[in-house]
Amino acid sequence: MLLSGGKPPAQEWFMVQTKSKPRVHRQRLQVQRIFRVKVTAFQSRPDTPYFWLQLEGPRENTGKAKEYLKGLCNPELWKEVRYPPVLHCAFLGAQGLFLDCLCWSTLAYLVPGPPGSLMVGGLTESFTMTQNWLEELVARLRWGPAPMITPRGVWETEVTRAFGALVWIRCDKYAGDLLQLPPAVQELLLSLVRDAAGKEDIIEWLGHFGISGTCPNPEILICLARQQKESASLVTIKESPGTLQEIGALNRASENSKKTTSSGAAGSLTQAQSPPAQETADQLARDQSNKQGDETNSVGEEGTATQDTSSQDSENPTQALLQQKQVPKNEERISLLLPVSALSAYTSWKVWAPGTAFGPSWPGTIAATFWKINELQSLHLAWLLSQACLNFPFWQRPTGPIQLKLPGRNPLPLKLEWKQKELVPLSSAGSPACRPGGDLGRETALKHSPRPEIPSKIISLSVVPGGCGIKEKVSPGLLQVGQSSTSVGDKGISLSDCKGLEKPFSLALSTEQGGSTAQERPLAQVPEAPTVSETLQVATAAEVSNVEHPPTGEGLPATPKVPTALKKPAVYTEPTAPKVPSAPTEPAAPATPTAPQTPTAQKTPSVKTLAGLQTPKVQSETIATAGSEVPKAPAASAVAGPTVDVAQLLSEVQASKNRAIMLKVQGKPGRQGFQPSSTVPSRSKHQFLKEGLLGAWEGSQRLSPHSQGTNIVTSFQRYNEALNTPFEMNLSEEPGNPGLRRVVIDGSSVAMVHGLQHFFSCRGIAMAVQYFWNRGHREITVFVPTWQLKKNRRVRESHFLTKLHRLKMLSITPSQLENGKKITTYDYRFMVKLAEETDGVIVTNEQIHILMNNSKKLMVKDRLLPFTFAGSLFMVPDDPLGRDGPTLEEFLKKPNRLDMDIGNFLKVWKTLPPSSASISELSDDADAEPLEDPQDVEEAGKEEGSLEEEPGIPKPDEEDEQDTNPVSVFGVECPSFSEEILQCLSLHDPSEGTLDIDLLPVVSSPYLDVPWDGKAPCQQVLAQLAQLNIPSNFTALSFFMGFMDSHRDVISDYEDLVGPLHGLLKQKPDWQWNQEHEKSFLALKRALVCALCLSTPNPNLPFYLEVTVSQVSLTASLHQEHSGRKHPIAYTSKPLLPDEDSEGPQSGGDSPYAVAWALKHFARCVGDNPVVLRLSYASRTTVDNEAWDSRRASKAWLIRWSLLLQDKGKRELELSLLQGLLGENQLLTPPSSMPRVFQPLPPSSDLSTFICVHVSGYCFYRDDELCAGFGLYILSPTSPPVSLAFSCSPYTTTYAHLAAVACGLERFGQSQHPVVFLTHCNWIFSVLWELLPLWRVRGFLSSDGASLPHPSLLSYIISLTSGFSPLPFIYRTSYRGSLFAVTVDTLAKQGAQGGGQWWDLPKDVPVPMVTPHPKGRKPNLLALQLSDTTLADIIAKLQAGQKLSGPSPFSSAFNSLSLDQDSGLLMFKGERHPRVWVVPRQLRRDLIFSVHDSPIGEHQGLEDTYKTVRLLGWWPGMQDHVRDYCRSCLFCIPRNLIGGELKVIESPWPLRSTAPWSSLQIEVVGPVTVSEEGHKHVLIVADANTRWVEAFPLKPYTHVAVAQVLLQHVFARWGVPIRLEAAQGPQFARHVLVSCGLALGAQVTTLSRALQFPCLMSSEAYWEFKRALKEFIFLYGKKWAASLPLLHLAFRASTTEATPFQVLTGGEMKLMEPVWWEMSRANIEGLKMDAFLLQLMRELLDLHWRVAEKASEKAENRRFKRESQENEWSVGDQVLLLSLPRNGSSAKWMGPFYIGDRLSLSLYRVWGFPVPDKLGCVYPSSLMKAFPKHDTPLSLDVEQ
């Protein structure tokens, strides 16, 4: 093969993974079509996971196809791209041309979704190119048209004309939308096509390019047969949703011709749309759209792709047409089928019309094509057509032939008819056209798609050349490309020439049935056969219907839509019979308005039949199938018309009866799996005259040859006479009884019984449906096989099926034709499955239960409802299951399946042999009775009541009373489950004394009248269920699964639980029962017991929790009490492993951790309701005095623990408690209940209808002065874009952002359109969406009680949003570098630099009442001094007027000491310093910390720290103390340490200090159970002085990991301890401290000699905690790491010692629950201390200002107070965080991050760390520093 240039095609080879083979196979045809290459796959060796692909074609094409396939098989990106929905036509219009061109250009895999959505996949470069092209397309959408007088306007006019011509060539239902696009968009689309076509001729390129497989079926057919001379033309304009042929095929058909095909093809298009035809085309389309509504058809993607690239297309499809159709030399026939929306799956395309003329308007390759269009000389024909007919109104248009003088030699008689076309059901798969060997089977059939029920009324215009010998219109079919000249399509006729129209239709039929050599394709639009009497031959003109053909490969075609419009009555004529007035039309659906009729179709003469009988009125609402061969018979005329031999027809009637009798002898006609082909109505060449559509025989009389001469009454005669009685199925709209079962009707059985086993009487089905509808049933389903819907004269009154299908009550089972035999799917399977899944009954007379397997035989037998007909009455028995069974009322009522199905299951189980083989034998204790085998159960069951044996008969009253007792299973007073039930549900062997059971309540089934726990089953049923052993054979397992499957609705995760057992059923010969099957078996039984025994929790009642902990197991039960009884809610039991001493858990039943575990385990059931604890004690083997004493102590502890657990706020600590905090020690508000200020923008919203306000703020420092501003960029649907820039008060960047939002709210508060605010700052989005509602609830206060910044602005925003209805929307844009984001950022910078207007809060804005309430109490300065013995002695000396005796640190400064006269405080007055307070010993270190480590000092040097501390107080040796503290500060290293400098690790504590945190003990425990986060070890940290213990999970067990935990949670607040004991040894402790210095950035680290590292001799301080930790990890399993705070809470509550805060301050301060839950104890105590120090500093500053003697001293005091407040960090400030190393690297600063909440001066909650865009963890200020201030403009809202 050579290419056009004579070059051989290039080949590309590359490998593809085998897993991508299905994807490549699906896209192979599309790749070949778009890239015009040949794709061949070669399988590699079987052991290799890949295969080879060969691409053959032009080098450029193969390269592009290779890149496309790479992205298809291994997509680097696969995302959804959104665009305005108005551009949806650009991707689906022009028959997918633009989408394919875009795929060619970008090499991306494109899948159009709903309007406004496009899935783009492939390589990154392809995705980016597609995204850029879409952005340009969207941008051009907003370009308006240029004035015509400008060069741009002239250019756009030319572009519009060229685009219109291209759209006309590739016309489809999106043509109107495409022509309404702006010229700029059209230009971009044309450029896309031009680039894809390259240098190739556009028409030839379009022919090669083909039709897209992603768009609906192309709806244009151009058939061209050129001759040497051009003269008169035959133009047939008709709607054709049928087969298609690409324009490119015409080029290949005319390669031997000297003239190009493009000219002719384009010319035919121009003929149909001349300038005067523009208005007529609009009118035609408008009339059409009004009548057909949204009824559409579609062709699937696969079918279209296969059709375009099939092997048949590789041949020349037009050569056979040109050879068979011998057209006269002086004529040229051009068939142009007007594009309509009959095949589209979407709404009708909009009315459109191209430009007035197509001229040489656009340069390039397309211009040449459009120039050829204007060269044609056929415009006169289209103009004459528009002037002759289409300008008249619909009801005034002529219907007779119109003589027009055209450019040809002969005048053309023109006949126009507008007729109603109706939808018909799917064609039968048994028709010859759909046979595998048939002609039509070679093509891909049209795919079915659902359509509305509004009937389609389509205008059909036909122009026939004169002189053809046709006097009347005779079934004008569709000219099909590639079909035989005499072939009749599935419903249409192809005419070869004028003479062919004169031939009888029977010849065409026989030719078609005999098979055609040409390739045929099914047509979706066909004429409809008339309704004909069985005794007559000739029919009147019938109507035209649409039909769809399913693909031959499909086994179950989709259900068709059935029309509701009224049809004309069937009227029969005889050549010699006189004319009589026509019978009135009898509507089938009165509620449906009658469609307008043409004048000639309103009245039709009616005649008598041969027997002299009156032809009955019939309803012709019919269903057409694919079995009919000819859709339309020639119209009968009083002047001329073909005659048919009546005797021949009558003989055929008798033959059909004989064949029916033969079928009856062979088997029941309604149930034939394989049926002979003789039943297919294709026996005679006149068969099309007699059958037509399904239902053509309804209402007609069947007369045998002997009926004319005898008066014998037959059953068939009585049946036909009964059909004369009108019957209308009237289904009222009254609501039915929801307590009735679903009715599944066997349509074949009912129809054949009513039709005397000879006719398929649809009236019988309608009677059955009407009967059950009147009884109150609303869930009715009728099953009918597909082959019963084909055109068969035995099918009567099929309009009933039409109505049932429209009401969604008819289900059609699939069937097919194989070698002339009907193969019908076993429709019993469908009926049984539906009845099983919906608990319905089956209405049938067939004994289908004998055909079912054992698992469903019993169920089916009890669901069959027999019936019969008594004349016109449908009757069912009153005792469907026999006289001993339930009544009809009970049978049709939804039963409580529990009692009945359990009884049935037990009855079957009793008949099975005993089972002995199981993995774990179920046994009782030694003294218990052995379990009964099934035989014993059966004998005992015979003596029991009839509840199990006969579910329909009630038991005696006393038994009913016992069975309905809700607690009969457990006994009246027994609070627990029976031992038998528990033992049969345990995964462990019950003989070991431990059970592993977990029973939780299930959701009540919506299919039952009463909830599952409304009526407890009898105790006997549960006892027998508990005794069922594990099944040991296939039969027992089948029964068990059948029983469980009937209760699958109440078993959660049923499919997962039953999966192993399903797999075992498939291994019937290889029965291997293993542990997995046993677990599945027990899990299913456990789930069913939960449904039987557990009650639904009542949220209005308290819960009772009982926990029992023995040495080997933990048992917990949850129940509620009402009506004097206990109702179990949940139950759990699990084995426990013994500890090292083999004594079980810590203290038996009083284990607080067991209670905590049980409470958390039942949290889903308990919710927020109160829980009453009922604890049990387990017996001990030996009880010594110490244990007894500890038991008494633990009992007192249990009292406190129970009170703790009953506190609702404490139990909610398991949740994420950061949001919704109301205040100190108050309940938490869930986020869902907080009133929102904004609402999120719904996904897939159309922003074109919103007022879009893009906001941004900007802030920078200029000459140490803060400048701020913001910008607004507004897009409105009613006005052009607006850009605004403002300057605002110099606050922070957060204030600038919020001011932008407030300004936008002010401007659009009264807008009629919804408003959406768009921001690319994640912090502002979080503030507006999450934090602002929380701040409003908390009174605009932070967690430490301080006022939030800018409360007036926050309150102003809330007040503005309250005036919106609905609330304004908010949306966070993901792309910061987008055009709108850059624009609004530029506006914000312009405003900050003073280039915009000034904005400030209105003066009348009310200021919210914000009352800061600092944490802690006001410190007593005198009491603090008196707590220091040295200061108390000095105060006493001064009060007594004495001097110090003996050595004292205050001896040298005693003369500077004095007492304040007002307060009695000890004060110090130094030289050149103001008078200050003397600091007691216990507060000196903390006072230095508050100055040095807090944001006020930010780890300043020695001098600055000393000056600041000197303003707050004095003590002897103060300067040395400050120097030692600064030298030992670890966190000054990353700020002040110079590279290479030595860092000595020192402790700020004295050598023999007994203060808290000065002496620590650490131990690493593990490895333990791996947590979900991957933690394997636990670090225990204990304070030997305060007995404080805490645990931290560790992932890596390294020195650096331990150092990191200590730095963040202990050392950051309390410094390095003077004494560090490690259980791993002194060397481990030394390495930990060295790692601290190295982690913080020190190059060389040494340890001070003062530090002590003794060996840990005793772990008494945390021995109890370590013991509890092991038990806690075992109870919580893999979730222990996330639940450690619960252990801390429980252990802290049990301690009686004073807390560190009490040791330091002598008081206790309450904290909010989130702090207790999320923070370590060291940080919690540090938080308390920070609150105390803050109050202390404020009190000291007030004291010093009051005692100041000079004005300068007061000024210095106020300056320090003001600077300290300004330097404090607040919410919204930006900081940098010191990220500690994790893999041995040094620490580094990260950020900036926003402060989301302030807990104290040294503890903050950071937003965005460690989880982006979320309120993160608590961080100490020692590991934070302020974001640097720059002199140059710098945006402070930089994200991390």
From Swiss-Prot:
Bias kind Acidic residues: ranges: 922-938, 946-963
InterPro entries assigned to the protein according to its UniProt record, in alphabetical order: DNA/RNA_pol_sf (IPR043502), Integrase_cat-core (IPR001584), Integrase_H2C2 (IPR041588), KH_N4BP1_1st (IPR056629), KH_N4BP1_2nd (IPR056630), Rev_trsase/Diguanyl_cyclase (IPR043128), RNase_Zc3h12_NYN (IPR021869), RNaseH-like_sf (IPR012337)
Protein keywords: Membrane, Transmembrane, Transmembrane helix
Domain RNase NYN, first and last residues per copy: 740-890
Name of a matching Pfam family: RT_RNaseH_2
Residue stretches making up the Integrase catalytic domain: 1552-1724
Bias type Low complexity, positions: 582-606
Biased composition (Polar residues): 259-283, 295-327
Localization in the cell: Membrane
Location of the region described as Disordered in the Swiss-Prot/TrEMBL record: 249-327, 427-449, 545-564, 574-615, 918-968, 1125-1149
Protein's UniProt name: Protein NYNRIN
